[in-house]
Amino acid sequence: MKVVISGYGKMGHMIEAVLQRRGIELVMASEDVCSVPDDIAKECVCIDFTTPEAFRANYPTIAAKFKAVVVGTTGWYDIKDQVFAAFDRHNTTLIWASNFSIGVNAFFAAIQRVCEVLKEGDYTPSVKEIHHIHKLDAPSGTAKSIADLIEKGLGRAPEIESKRIGEVPGTHTAEFVSGVDKLVFTHEAFSRQGFAEGAVVAALLTEKVTGIQEFKDIIL
């Protein structure tokens, strides 16, 4: 497998290190992925960790150029239908996620199961998330994913509280409160390393799956 990294910030450098450790060829890391030559792109998986604005501008070209694409960028889900249509049109495999951490995806599975158990009870749900001050979207894509799971499971949408503090990699908490008890579930990331590891796992999965896939639906 050959990889092009779209976005060469902190996450891009972490992904580069994971690829190197796994012996996966990194063809290039670029802040201008649209300029990658077509003959190179068609042989590569693109791993995109940019900004919402950059992905919104670049996705038509990314979908047309690359063999497969892994998208860890969030903040574009309001145009999900247009994005998916572009990848469908070019028959390009897309794996996307609000969070590629394996631990977070286990957290998703736990919340889904908890909601199945609590749905007959009188519980008020809420979601809290804390991220570093550089995080552009609020609530985070992960917080929205947790809220969606809760709404589907309990039939009521939780309130989401978002905070941006220092260099916090990401902490997400789901609470369920009734008149008799409270359940609290928390995932705390110690670094962004887990996101990079999961993104590379997703890139490897593009050799086994096709179409448009959400990461959690593949691994859970």
Regions found by a protein language model. Give the residues of each.
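Short, ordered loop/turn segments at secondary-structure junctions
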Residues: 74-76, 99-100, 130-132
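Hydrophobic beta-strand scaffold residues
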Residues: 26, 69-70, 93-94
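C-terminal substrate-binding/catalytic lobe of Rossmann-fold NAD(P)-dependent oxidoreductases
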Residues: 2-6, 10-38, 51, 120-220
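Rossmann-fold NAD(P)-binding glycine/threonine-rich loop
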Residues: 73-96, 105-114
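N-terminal Rossmann-like NAD(P) cofactor-binding module of classical short-chain dehydrogenase/reductase
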Residues: 46-47, 70
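Rossmann-fold NAD(P) dinucleotide-binding segment
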Residues: 39-40, 52-73, 80-84
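Conserved acidic residues
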Residues: 27, 44-45
